[in-house]
């Protein structure tokens, strides 16, 4: 079905959306897909995206929302089809299609697809704070990174830093892209700046394969 738009609403099916870049350096190529629902509908008041994965693959990668501070996003996971096994702070939850799972920012979570094509919609926002969408160049940078074009990825990420000069994750990603592009000095500069902003970035630096 085609997308419909008028003054009061926008309609689209998830099947109409093209898979979007994975927003993590070094993410495994395991068939998981991300759909940028927020950007497709030009939503600016909250974050929303969807993930789809084959059986046995993590639909939701293991993470917390407080790695870089205590004001991370509160998230609601909606199992649209298929089924998933959630693991949240050591507890297991079986979530068939139609399930809603709300997770606090500090909780460590992941969800594994039990069926091929399991799809989860994720809605998130930081309690008590207005939502601030990431610059488009951040997604563009990862699109280039995922094709091996590290120079373009770095160029796009530099634009992100012009808009968010005090963003630790933005500096960290720029450091990863610079390292892949063979620009060691610039990589160290960005990583050093990220560590100045928050020492919590050490966990990412220690585990990221781009920085080996």
Residue ranges and their predicted role:
Residues 1-61:
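A short, N-terminal "cap"/entry segment at the start of jelly-roll beta-barrel domains
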Residues 131-163:
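Alpha-helical segment of the N-proximal tetratricopeptide repeat
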Residues 173, 207-208:
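Canonical tetratricopeptide repeat
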Residues 135, 169, 203-204:
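Start-of-helix register in tetratricopeptide repeats
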Residues 68-86:
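Short, conserved beta-strand element in jelly-roll/cupin
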Residues 105-130:
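Ligand-binding loop in jelly-roll beta-barrel domains
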Residues 90-105:
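Short acidic-glycine-tyrosine-enriched beta hairpin
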């Amino acid at each position: 079905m085609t997308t419909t738009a008028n003054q009061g609403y926008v309609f689209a099916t998830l099947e109409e959306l093209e898979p979007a870049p994975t927003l993590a350096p070094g993410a495994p190529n395991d068939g998981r897909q991300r759909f940028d629902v927020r950007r497709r509908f030009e939503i600016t008041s909250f974050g929303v995206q969807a993930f789809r994965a084959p059986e046995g693959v993590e639909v939701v990668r293991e993470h917390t929302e407080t790695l870089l501070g205590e004001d991370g996003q509160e998230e609601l996971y909606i199992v649209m089809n298929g089924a998933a096994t959630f693991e949240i702070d050591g507890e297991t939850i079986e979530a068939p299609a139609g399930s809603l799972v709300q997770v606090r920012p500090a909780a460590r979570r992941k969800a594994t697809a039990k069926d091929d094509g399991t799809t989860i919609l994720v809605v998130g926002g930081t309690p008590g704070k207005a939502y601030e969408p990431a610059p488009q160049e951040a997604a563009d940078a990862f699109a280039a990174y995922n094709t091996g074009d590290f120079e373009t990825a770095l160029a796009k990420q530099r634009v992100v830093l012009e808009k968010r000069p005090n963003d630790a994750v933005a500096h960290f990603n720029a450091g990863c892209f610079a390292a892949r592009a063979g620009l060691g000095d610039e990589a160290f500069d960005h990583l050093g700046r990220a560590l100045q902003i928050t020492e919590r970035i050490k966990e990412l630096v220690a585990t990221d394969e781009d920085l080996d």
